């Protein structure tokens, strides 16, 4: 046991050292090859460290420095190891493939940003004091911005990056305020003293819960913060999206979960109120995000909004766990907590697969637009298998890991009906209804992405995906199925994660042999492991019927029907807009769609030379929240700028007033 703990500690130190060296090397090396090798090796060491540590946790490692008179310590819990493992699996592939930036300088910048982001994410997962945690949080944000700048896909990347950083800094201020309030109550900046689980809930604890939700929700994309996702992701490459939707999202969620489940009170009406707000915020985020994802026509933007949707689902289930815990149901709360971890693991693998596919699509088509080009016809079958498994998981289709996590989510909500009180039960009911809508739209979204984005007649391109990319997509996509099929054994790694927080090993009650059960096999059960055996056998029936039928009925290929006229199938193929137009029209109160048709004439109004069609979807929060805030800040800036008068006496007076204020605080604040 001691040797394993020592090996785990050494592996974590080596991982961080490799990433730190890679950041420095990326800035001075001519081509960035060594930086890439260092980051890939660091990811491999990190994955090995997670495998060594699971199930269990790392020992507390002192880094030998102090911040604000608090020793900086590092420790990865069982949940942190789980999220780190499934975040690093896609990251190692994206580090190997790299960005598709055209310039060498851009690639070097991207690798430097990747190293910073990984260091920050691991710091968020493991650092044990407020000061170093905030440094890691900001490092993760800045690293992400550097990655987008390195990609160089947008003509003006500054606007989306600054919008992203601006909203993230709003969250950072909320986190800072929450940590200051918690530190003031604990008398220390160490997270060890933040444990107020047994304290009585007060309005202050309710405020702390909201601050944590706002702070970490800014990174997770909880409304209204998800509006930075499409622009920021759309300005970078798919490789950047892999990191953002993988280890970064996992780290932000873990920080939020640690805050609400370990730092805040677990009983009282104020706790239940904060949990209810978290549930509604998560469900509404998931609904709005997936609706907006469905109408997107860009791979990166669609997948980014899907990431916000999955983060919203995870936050909603986390709120359910908190509410169940406050209601005196620790076993059901532990079930919800483990379901969150399963959901994020499946999401990291599937989303990483599709972001890598998006970069391959860009290399073939020259853009990330979702359009039929028949890419699968000209590429190996393993590419389609990997992408299909990922799309099925995100659409919650059996037997993929996404289906397993969604099934567990609804079973958790059904268990949630055991709570006492009409408001709590009504919250569970509305959450179940909202998430059911999310699942339905997600199915349509990924049917559109896979069907239009990868299928078609196949007569446009003769090029193929790079072999390394094809292999990465297949391995990552297949790992989604491996996670689902091996779920009875994977759950063993999550027992300590629930035991440490809830005092209940819920993972042991979530499996019965090859069956997956929600705490009891008398409530419900599924078995992805058995599905893998049975489904291929059942598939033999339609395959046999097809083979028999082909003897009597020969295959005919005829042109697509188009009003009785012969049209080029490529010209009348289903477009992304056509696929989503029905839902866009039905839910027009959400989308606020606008269409604009302009005509250019030649020699009079009867001779149309060109039609220009433009369609847009009105943003929900932009005109009503962000724009008024920007205008208000500009007015404040104009008012404050009058203080810059150039008169030295005025400046001295302001300094004197500030000193008096500081003295007053020192004398009267207790």
Please identify what each model-predicted range represents.
Residues 11-28, 40-54, 83-100, 117-121, ...:
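Central hydrophobic cores of alpha-helical transmembrane segments in multi-pass inner-membrane proteins
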Residues 490-535, 547-670:
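Aromatic-capped, Gly/Pro-kinked transmembrane alpha-helices
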Residues 4-6, 66-82, 196-209, 274, ...:
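Short aromatic-rich membrane-water interface segments that cap or initiate transmembrane helices
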Residues 28-34, 110-207, 291-369:
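Alpha-helical multi-pass transmembrane bundles of energy-transducing inner-membrane proteins
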Residues 62-65, 93, 160, 164, ...:
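Short helix-boundary/re-entrant hairpin motifs in multi-pass inner-membrane proteins
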Residues 223, 351-355, 428-464, 533-558:
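Predominantly late transmembrane helices and immediately cytosolic-facing juxtamembrane segments
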Residues 59-68, 192-197, 408-422, 490-524:
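Membrane-interfacial helical/loop segments at transmembrane boundaries in membrane proteins
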Residues 2-14, 20-112, 188-196, 496, ...:
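Transmembrane helix-loop-helix hairpins at membrane boundaries of multipass inner-membrane proteins
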């Amino acid at each position: 046991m001691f040797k394993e703990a020592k090996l785990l500690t050494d592996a974590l130190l080596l991982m961080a050292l490799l990433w730190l060296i890679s950041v420095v090397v990326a800035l001075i090396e001519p081509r960035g090859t060594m930086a890439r090798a260092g980051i890939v090796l660091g990811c491999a060491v990190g994955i090995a460290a997670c495998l060594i540590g699971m199930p269990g946790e790392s020992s507390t490692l002192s880094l030998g420095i102090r911040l604000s008179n608090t020793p900086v310590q590092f420790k990865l819990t069982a949940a942190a190891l789980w999220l780190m493992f499934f975040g690093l699996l896609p990251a190692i592939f994206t580090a190997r493939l790299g960005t598709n930036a055209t310039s060498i300088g851009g690639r070097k910048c991207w690798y430097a940003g990747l190293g910073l982001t990984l260091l920050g994410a691991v710091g968020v997962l493991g650092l044990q004091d407020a000061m170093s945690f905030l440094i890691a949080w900001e490092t993760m944000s800045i690293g992400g911005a550097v990655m987008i700048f390195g990609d160089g896909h947008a003509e003006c990347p500054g606007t989306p990056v600054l919008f992203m950083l601006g909203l993230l800094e709003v969250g950072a201020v909320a986190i800072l305020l929450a940590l200051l309030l918690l530190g003031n109550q604990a008398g220390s900046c160490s997270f060890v003293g933040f444990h107020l689980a047994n304290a009585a809930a007060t309005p202050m604890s309710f405020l702390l819960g909201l601050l944590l939700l706002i702070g970490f929700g800014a990174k997770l994309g909880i409304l209204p913060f998800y509006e930075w996702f499409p622009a920021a992701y759309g300005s970078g490459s798919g490789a950047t999206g892999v990191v953002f939707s993988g280890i970064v999202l996992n780290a932000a969620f873990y920080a939020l979960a640690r805050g609400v489940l370990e730092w805040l009170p677990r009983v009282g009406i104020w706790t239940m109120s904060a949990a209810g707000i978290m549930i509604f915020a998560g469900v509404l985020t998931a609904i709005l995000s997936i609706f907006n994802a469905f109408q997107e026509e860009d791979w990166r933007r669609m997948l980014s909004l899907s990431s916000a949707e999955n983060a919203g689902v995870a936050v909603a289930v986390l709120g359910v766990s908190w509410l169940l815990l406050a209601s005196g149901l620790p076993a059901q709360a532990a079930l919800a907590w483990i379901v969150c971890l399963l959901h994020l693991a499946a999401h990291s693998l599937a989303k990483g697969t599709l972001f890598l596919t998006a970069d391959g699509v860009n290399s073939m088509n020259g853009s990330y637009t979702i359009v039929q080009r028949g890419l699968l016809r000209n590429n190996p079958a393993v590419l389609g298998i990997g992408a299909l498994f990922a799309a099925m998981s995100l659409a919650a289709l059996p037997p993929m890991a996404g289906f397993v996590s969604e099934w567990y989510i609804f079973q958790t909500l059904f268990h949630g009906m055991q709570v006492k009180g009409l408001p709590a039960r009504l919250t569970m009911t509305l959450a179940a209804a909202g998430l059911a809508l999310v699942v339905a739209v997600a199915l349509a979204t990924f049917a559109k992405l896979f069907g239009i984005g990868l299928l078609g007649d196949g007569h446009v391109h003769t090029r193929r995906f790079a072999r390394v990319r094809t292999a990465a997509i297949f391995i990552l996509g297949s790992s989604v199925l491996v996670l689902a099929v091996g779920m009875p054994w994977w759950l063993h790694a999550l027992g300590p994660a629930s035991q440490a927080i809830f005092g209940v090993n819920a993972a042991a009650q979530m499996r019965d042999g090859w069956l997956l059960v929600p705490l009891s096999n008398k409530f419900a059960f599924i078995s992805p492991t058995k599905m893998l055996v049975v489904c291929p056998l059942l598939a033999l029936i339609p395959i046999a019927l097809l083979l028999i039928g082909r003897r009597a009925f020969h295959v005919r290929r005829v042109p697509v029907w188009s009003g009785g006229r012969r049209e080029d199938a490529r010209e009348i193929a289903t477009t992304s807009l056509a696929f989503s137009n029905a839902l866009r029209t039905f839910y027009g109160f959400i989308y606020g769609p606008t269409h604009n048709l302009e005509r250019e004439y030649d020699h009079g109004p009867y001779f149309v030379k060109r039609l220009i069609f433009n369609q847009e979807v009105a943003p929900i929060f932009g005109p009503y929240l962000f724009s008024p805030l920007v205008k208000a800040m500009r007015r404040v800036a104009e008012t404050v700028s009058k203080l810059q008068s150039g008169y030295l006496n005025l400046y001295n007076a302001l300094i004197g007033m500030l000193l008096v204020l500081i003295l007053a605080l020192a004398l009267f604040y207790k």
